Amino acid sequence: MDKKLLFQPIQIGKLKLRNRMVFPPMNTNYSNTDGSPMELMMDYYARRAKGGAGLVVVESTTIDPTSRNHGAQSQFSDTSYIPLYSKLVDKIHRYGAKAAIELTHFGADGTVSSGGEEPAPSDVTSRGAQYSVHAMTIDDIHAMQEQYVQAVVNAKSAGFDAVTFHAAHGNIMPEFFSTLYNKRTDWYGGSLENRVRFAREIVEMARKAVGPAFPLIMRISGDEYIEGGRTLDETVEICRILEKAGIDCFDVSGGIQASYIFSIAPYNLPGLHGFMMPSAKAIKEAVNVPVIGVGGVRDPELAEKFLEEGYADMIALGRSFIADPDFGVKAMEGRSADIRPCLTCGNCFNEICCDRILTCTVNPETGREDDFKGIEEAKEKKKVLVVGGGAAGMESARVLALRGHKVTLLEKNDHIGGSVSAAGVP
């Protein structure tokens, strides 16, 4: 095996991963109307497992059917969802990856679907959503904690190897952490210890319910990137508390709903690639469990650099695996030049925000995995002439060559690309 750290096994608690490449949770809108996973979702995640990811984390999945954040919101609110999620897990396992699922309640960042008010730590609306909210009572808090624990138990019953608690990007857990939204004066507000209590009790209850061997991961924003929001120093202390409560791994991201623009690094500013890694490093130095680093890491060499320099123990490569589902395999085979790069154009994010299904500008396979089962070798090899080196001509030539034909591509200009070249001019 390659000696690079990126391809070396690692453990989260007692769970052994084949490598350190993580496909992190990102919304797809590939759910049925009841929140259960469509076959499309299953094929999508399985394809990233086939492409070499060591851990595949299924997208943000709500524990409560009344909590929604986008169009086709995935749910795991009761045991009726177990059979379909079990099928999804089996498809991921088929290719040697481990499967986790991210559990959440969106709190003030949810969208009102029934004319009611969203539950929140206090009567403070989200700066990113601006929906009506109501301050949760102690009974409300305890009921939601039970929902979280039941979802963890259900996930384990479905065969997931781990769960991730979503405490990044704005939802109920970070709302309790934050003095921007948490104005409570009881045991769940005020001091840092009190503001962490909601999440800490969930972790402790979940640990008791599923036992010591089932990994619990916490995805958390290192810095909220907003004036008055939580800073890295405070997040480090939160992680220390949650580690003692039973968290086995931290997945360190950044931003909240109101500062989401900072969650995606622009491609034309290479200096920002991996811009959240310092947050991961600070948390890694403060805890004794593995840390996943994230933030615009688009190539295996940069991922390896962050591992070697001690920024993180694993690297989340979300949009890299969306743009090229074989990112992992190509990286392990030393074919970095063959990896189709993510442009960080934001199309995937825009589609979700507009309640459409996830697609990718550079990868037509995304969202159509069932239609792209693989390019079969042609039974009869031919010599093929393709006239025109624009996008369509290049793609035709590429696929024909992969099928085994001998292809000649003709272009009247002194370069290929067609109108794509013109579109690339600043």
What are these regions (language model features)?
Residues G418-P426:
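N-terminal Rossmann-like dinucleotide/flavin-binding domain of flavoprotein oxidoreductases
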Residues M1-V407, K412-H415:
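Flavin-dependent oxidoreductase catalytic cores
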